[in-house]
UniProtKB/Swiss-Prot annotation:
Pfam families: FAM165. Residues 34-54 form a coiled coil. The keyword Mitochondrion does not apply. Keywords: Coiled coil, Membrane, Transmembrane, Transmembrane helix. This is Small integral membrane protein 11. InterPro entries: SMIM11. It is found in: Membrane. It comes from Mus musculus.
Amino acid sequence: MNWKVLEHVPLLLYILAAKTLILCLAFAGVKMYQRRSLEGKLQAEKRKQSEKKAS
């Protein structure tokens, strides 16, 4: 067995953990952005409907 490879395993695990964390944060950020844009559209739709009822 190649023992030199085993010396690099902790570094590879740290890189994998960092990559996973970055991907999770990016995914959460995209979901937050989508939710905010959807809420904005719903607010605009409610405003339009309330203006129609008022006039």
